[in-house]
UniProtKB/Swiss-Prot annotation:
This is DNA-directed RNA polymerase RPB5 homolog. GO terms for biological process: transcription by RNA polymerase II; transcription elongation by RNA polymerase I; tRNA transcription by RNA polymerase III; viral transcription. Part of the viral DNA-directed RNA polymerase that consists of 8 polII-like subunits (RPB1, RPB2, RPB3, RPB5, RPB6, RPB7, RPB9, RPB10), a capping enzyme and a termination factor. Pfam families: RNA_pol_Rpb5_C (PF01191).
C-alpha cells in the first residue's frame, strides 16, 4: 500500500514543486519491479533554475538501506555524472532513519558536495498530498526581500521569529531550505486568516 501511494504522490510532489520530468512516467508495475530488483527507483527532474533534482525511492529491504558501502557508491557515482545537480532526495522506510551507517554516509556526501542539497525523508511524507490536507494551514515561501520588509516593519531579527524545521512536511513539499522564510495562514476568529512568518532551520537529519 505504501508503494502504491508513493508512486502516486511522488509525481504530485514533483508537479507541486514546479519541476519538469526528464523521463516519461513509468507504469506502476515497472516501478515496483525496479524497486524489488535493483533496490531503488529513480526519477530525474529539472527545476525552474535548470538544476537537476534526482529522487530515489528505496525499497525497505534492499541492499542500499542496509549496507553503507553500497549507498556510498550509489551516491558517489550519481554525483560524478557531471550533471548540474541541485538536490538529491532520498526516500526510505522510516526505520532506516535510525541507521547510523546510512546517516553517516549522508553527512559524508553533504560535506563532499556542499553546493548540492542532499536530504533523506521517510515514506510517509510522500504518501499523501500535504498541500491538499485541509487540517494543515497554507504554507508559502516568501522572498528574502519580503521577509526583510516584514522584519523591518516589526523591528525584528530572524532569530526573533518562531522557527520551523526544514523537515516539516509542508516545508519539504515547498522545497524550503534553512535560512528561508515561510508564511503560514492560520484560521482566525477575528479575521479570515492570521498570517505568521516562520524562519526555516536545519533539520536534525
Amino acid at each position: 500500500m505504501a508503494m502504491q501511494k508513493l508512486f502516486t504522490y511522488i509525481y504530485e510532489f514533483i508537479k507541486y514543486r514546479k519541476m519538469v520530468l526528464l523521463e516519461e512516467k513509468v507504469p506502476y508495475d515497472k516501478f515496483v519491479q525496479m524497486v524489488l530488483n535493483t533496490g531503488f527507483f529513480r526519477i530525474n527532474a529539472e527545476t525552474l533554475n535548470h538544476g537537476i533534482v534526482s529522487v530515489f525511492i528505496f525499497g525497505a529491504n534492499g541492499k542500499y538501506v542496509h549496507h553503507g558501502g553500497d549507498m556510498r557508491t550509489l551516491l558517489t557515482n550519481t554525483l560524478n555524472e557531471k550533471k548540474h545537480y541541485e538536490e538529491l532526495i532520498l526516500i526510505v522506510d522510516k526505520p532506516v532513519l535510525s541507521k547510523k551507517n546510512i546517516l553517516d554516509i549522508i553527512v559524508e556526501q553533504r560535506a563532499a558536495n556542499p553546493t548540492i542539497v542532499i536530504n533523506i525523508y521517510p515514506y510517509h511524507l510522500f504518501c499523501i498530498n500535504i498541500p491538499k490536507v485541509s487540517a494543515i494551514p497554507r504554507h508559502k515561501l516568501i522572498t528574502q526581500e519580503e521577509a526583510q520588509e516584514f522584519l523591518g516593519r516589526e523591528y525584528l531579527q530572524p532569530q526573533d521569529l518562531m522557527q520551523i524545521s526544514a523537515s516539516d512536511p509542508p516545508v519539504v513539499w515547498l522545497g524550503g531550505r534553512p535560512g528561508d522564510f515561510v508564511q503560514i495562514e492560520r484560521p482566525s476568529e477575528t479575521a479570515m486568516h492570521a498570517v505568521v512568518i516562520r524562519f526555516i532551520t536545519k533539520s536534525k537529519i
